[in-house]
From Swiss-Prot:
NCBIfam families: small_GTP. This is Ras-related protein Rab-8. One of its GO terms (molecular function) is GTPase activity. It is a lipid-anchor. InterPro entries: P-loop_NTPase, Small_GTP-bd, Small_GTPase, Small_GTPase_Rab. It holds the Pfam family Ras. A lipid is attached at C207 (S-geranylgeranyl cysteine). The lineage of its organism: Eukaryota, Metazoa, Chordata, Craniata, Vertebrata. A motif (Effector region) lies at residues 37-45. Belongs to the small GTPase superfamily. Rab family. One of its GO terms (cellular component) is plasma membrane. Keywords: Cell membrane, GTP-binding, Lipoprotein, Membrane, Methylation, Nucleotide-binding, Prenylation. GTP binds at residues 15-22, 63-67, 121-124. It comes from the Eukaryota. It comes from Diplobatis ommata.
Length: 210
C-alpha cells in the first residue's frame, strides 16, 4: 500500500501533570476541547497530517504522563523524538519552575539535535496568572528555545505552535540532506578520475634475409 505522506515526524509533549498537554493534543489533532479529561496514564498519541512547502508531513504526537511514577516509561520515548514541547501552566508557578528539570531530562535522554519549544499554557486564565509572559520568554532565551503562550480552551497559538515546530524540523532535515548531497559531490571531486585502460599495442616485425 502506497504511503499517503512524504515524511513522518515524531513529536513529544512533556511537562507536569495537569498543565494541559492532553488538551493541547486534542485541540490540534481534533479541534476539540474537553474539561473532563483525566490524567494520562503512561503515554498516548494522536496523528495529524499537515502540508508544508508542498510536502505531506505526518505528525505522530505523543502525550506523556507528568507524574513521577511514569517517568521511567515516558523517558524511553524521548530517544526517537524529532521535536519536544515542554509545557507549563501559567497559573501554576511550580509547573514553570519544573521546566528546567524537564529540560535536563531531554538533555539526558533525547537526541542532541532534537527541536524544542516551551509552551506557557492556559493563557486564557489571565486573572489567575502566576507566571508572567516575560519570565517565560526569558527562560526560553536562556536555553535558546522558541516560546509561545497557548490556550487549548480558546484555541490560542495551538496550531501555530505545532506547525512552527514541524517547520523547524523540516528546515533542519532539508539542511542535512543538502549537506549530505554537497559532501557527496565534494568526495567525487576529490577522487582522482580513473584512467581508461589501454591495451598495449603489440608490434610484429618481419625479418627478411636478402
Amino acid at each position: 500500500m502506497a504511503k499517503t505522506y512524504d515524511y513522518l515526524f515524531k513529536l513529544l509533549l512533556i511537562g507536569d501533570s495537569g498543565v494541559g498537554k492532553t488538551c493541547l493534543l486534542f485541540r490540534f489533532s481534533e479541534d476539540a476541547f474537553n474539561t473532563t479529561f483525566i490524567s494520562t496514564i503512561g503515554i498516548d498519541f494522536k496523528i495529524r497530517t499537515v502540508e508544508l512547502d508542498g510536502k505531506k508531513i505526518k505528525l505522530q504526537i505523543w502525550d506523556t504522563a507528568g507524574q513521577e511514577r511514569f517517568r521511567t516509561i515516558t523517558t524511553a520515548y524521548y530517544r526517537g523524538a524529532m521535536g519536544i514541547m515542554k509545557v507549563y501552566d501559567i497559573t501554576n508557578e511550580k509547573s514553570f519552575d519544573n521546566i528546567k528539570n524537564w529540560i535536563r531530562n531531554i538533555e539526558e535522554h533525547a537526541s542532541s539535535d532534537v527541536e524544542r519549544m516551551i509552551l506557557g499554557n492556559k493563557c486564557d486564565m489571565n486573572e489567575k496568572r502566576q507566571v508572567s509572559k516575560e519570565r517565560g520568554e526569558k527562560l526560553a532565551i536562556d536555553y535558546g528555545i522558541k516560546f509561545l503562550e497557548t490556550s487549548a480552551k480558546s484555541s490560542i497559538n495551538v496550531e501555530e505552535a505545532f506547525i512552527t515546530l514541524a517547520r523547524d524540523i523540516m528546515t533542519k532535515l532539508n539542511k542535512k540532506m543538502n549537506e549530505n548531497s554537497l559532501q557527496e559531490a565534494v568526495d567525487k571531486l576529490k577522487s582522482p578520475p580513473k584512467k581508461p585502460s589501454q591495451k598495449k599495442k603489440q608490434l610484429s616485425f618481419r625479418c627478411s634475409l636478402l
